[in-house]
A protein has these predicted regions:
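Hydrophobic alpha-helical transmembrane bundles of multi-pass membrane proteins
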Residues: 1-356
């Protein structure tokens, strides 16, 4: 379910629920199972032959899910109005920044349990070392690495984004993902320094993916999880080489980490791309433009996301930095997508009604 939840945020506002559920089943029940057997199991071929080291699933969970998501996004396409006629990206403001930041904080607290669950695989590979209840020493090691990873990620995200709230907190998430692969061997001070670079990398990668590749990743999942997930196993090859890994105690190495990256990247990306391409050809991947513009909550459930509050006009930030109401921008994008061939479609955007 973790891999599927990573994908969900990137696809919001335009993917069909049925298509997402099919992709989630494929990613969480097939692709992830395969890569976990290869590089996370103590008897996996990547660990026993090449010493691939990914203790808390930087690439096994986050990297593969990010690569899968990238493949889906290429077929799904951007949201209406995300890019102008020149291909420059616009920024959609969050409808509630407080809830956005609260959600990120809930993810942070969940990581403490997620790390503990990841260690169960080591109790299978090395019987008697750990148990499902863990121990005070193990819990302390988990907590300190996670905490330092978040702290460093916050620092890097804050500097790279110049204090942007979303990217500052996302940088904390990217930081802990960047040190997850070597969390069992890193010194806390090293984890802090490496996570700073991970937080900064997520911001730069997110901007590059949006502005250069023109891919609309609504929450930066590819940058935070995909890029930083593979960055995490890359760092192990540099800063944690020589540690015994797997049942055969093969030492970890830079080459072994690259081998794991070369196995996981195409596994995730090609699976997501091919599956979403088939759904696209069957016209099952994306909702119709008028449904996207109205909003999936309103179209499917006739229910606004905050029914207890009056809806206010939403805003969008243009490429030149000017903030304007989103309704005219989205209606213009809707006309471009439909080529003006859908007269009489009634839409409501940000509290404003219009007809095309």
């Amino acid at each position: 379910w973790t891999t599927a939840s990573i994908m969900s945020g990137a696809l919001i506002e335009r993917v069909r629920l049925s298509a997402y559920l099919l992709l989630a089943v494929l990613l969480g029940s097939a692709v992830w199972i395969m890569d976990a057997a290869w590089g996370w199991s103590g008897a996996g071929w990547l660990t026993t032959r090449f010493g691939f080291h990914d203790s808390i699933a930087s690439a096994v969970v986050h990297g593969v899910a990010g690569a899968f998501t990238l493949g889906v996004l290429l077929n799904l396409g951007p949201r209406i109005g995300k890019f102008d006629m020149a291909g420059r990206a616009r920024t959609f403001r969050a409808h509630n920044t407080h809830l956005t930041l609260m959600g990120l904080m809930l993810i942070f607290t969940g990581f403490y349990a997620f790390y503990g669950a990841c260690l169960v695989i080591q109790s299978i590979a090395f019987p008697g070392w750990l148990n499902i209840y863990l121990s005070p020493t193990t819990l302390g090691a988990i907590a300190i690495v996670i905490t330092f990873g978040f702290a460093g990620g916050f620092t890097g995200g804050w500097f790279a984004s110049k204090g942007d709230p979303f990217w500052t907190l996302s940088g904390g998430l990217a930081g802990v993902i960047s040190v997850s692969a070597g969390a069992d061997v890193y010194h806390p001070s090293l984890a802090y320094l490496l996570s700073i670079s991970g937080g900064m990398l997520a911001v730069y990668a997110g901007v590059w993916i949006e502005r250069t590749l023109r891919i609309d990743d609504a929450v930066g999942a590819v940058a935070v999880h995909g890029v930083c997930g593979f960055y995490g196993v890359f760092l192990v090859g540099i800063f944690a080489g020589g540690f015994p890994t797997g049942l055969n105690n093969v030492p970890s190495s830079f080459g072994g980490q690259l081998m794991g990256m070369m196995a996981f990247l195409p596994l995730g990306f090609l699976s997501g791309y091919v599956a979403s391409w088939l759904l696209k050809k069957a016209n099952l991947l994306r909702v119709p433009p008028e449904v996207e513009l109205e909003g999936l909550d309103m179209a499917e459930f006739q229910q606004d996301f905050f029914p207890e509050f009056e809806r206010v006009p939403e805003t969008v930030v243009l490429p030149d930095g000017e903030e304007v109401e989103s309704a005219p921008v989205l209606l213009e994008g809707f006309a471009q997508v439909t080529n003006g061939h859908r007269p009489g479609v009634r839409v409501e955007v940000g509290g404003e009604e219009g007809r095309r």
